Regions:
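N-terminal cap/leader regions of alpha/beta-hydrolase-fold enzymes
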Residues: 1-252
Length: 252
């Protein structure tokens, strides 16, 4: 379906307004909501295209600027070494509590909209995969998709590099989908095994999917992009969202 991608909101948080971009079907109606958390580069072209694709399948998609208190509104970091260095510096400058507050604010923004059914999911990529994992600890989140989520295995998200994401994994009550590239140096085999073992330990409802891909294999810019793998994994994501958000999970 065709979409609208021109809606911008400044969502209130205790650390200042969080610029948030909304993508939605053009047709009037009520739709499930999805928060898309970006990579360390913020709301880039590839992130916008991912949001548009999800919206075109019948969802309201909110994309917040993850570094809104550290970067000017509208700032996009380049896919180069300088951009990566700045994005990683920001990742470790921001307080863990601020990441969590931002997630709650983005979810609340969707839920209060008249065009939202109130059924909510999250998806994230790289840094955003970890943010989606933490956002799923909110009881309103029925489904979460984490693409090669960084820092979960090492517990190093946020200022001080000491998060409690694995410790709190048992708080996630919705359905999880974790997607990994086996050639991703940011989350090696040992790290992936640590995450999976913890999810098994807390009896999480999750699907685990590993592919022969590099870090950033779904980003449709650069030499690591693998279109075949990307579309395959997007299919898994949409299947989860359709079952849990659009059609409704009878268990919830």
């Amino acid at each position: 379906m065709t979409i609208k991608d021109d809606i911008v909101a400044d969502v209130s948080t205790s650390t200042g307004p969080m610029r948030t971009y909304l993508f939605r079907p053009a047709a009037e109606g009520k739709y499930p909501g999805v928060v898309l958390f970006s990579e360390i580069f913020q709301v880039t072209g590839p992130i916008r295209r991912t949001a548009a694709m999800i919206a075109g399948h019948g969802y309201l998609v909110a994309v917040p600027e993850v570094y809104h208190e550290l970067e000017p509104a509208g700032a996009v970091l380049a896919y180069d070494q300088a951009g990566a260095d700045k994005g990683n510096a920001d990742k470790y400058e921001k307080q863990l509590s601020s990441y969590d507050e931002d997630a709650r604010a983005a979810l609340a923004y969707l839920k209060q909209r008249e065009d939202c059914t109130g059924r909510l999911g999250v998806v994230g990529i790289c840094l955003g995969g970890h943010l989606a994992f933490r956002a799923a600890m909110n009881p309103d989140v029925l489904a979460a998709v984490c693409f090669y989520a960084t820092d979960i295995h090492s517990g190093t998200l946020g200022k001080g590099k000491k998060d409690n994401s694995l410790e709190r994994a048992g708080e996630i009550k919705g359905e999880l989908l974790h997607i990994w590239g086996r050639q991703d140096p940011h989350v090696p085999l040992e790290g992936r095994n640590r995450i999976k073992a913890r999810l098994d330990e807390v009896n999480a409802n999750f699907t685990w999917y590993e592919v022969n891909g590099a870090h950033a294999f779904i980003r449709d810019e650069g030499y690591r992009y693998d279109p075949a793998l990307a579309y395959q994994c997007y299919g898994l994501m949409l299947d989860l969202f359709h079952r849990t958000l659009a059609l409704g999970n009878p268990l919830r």
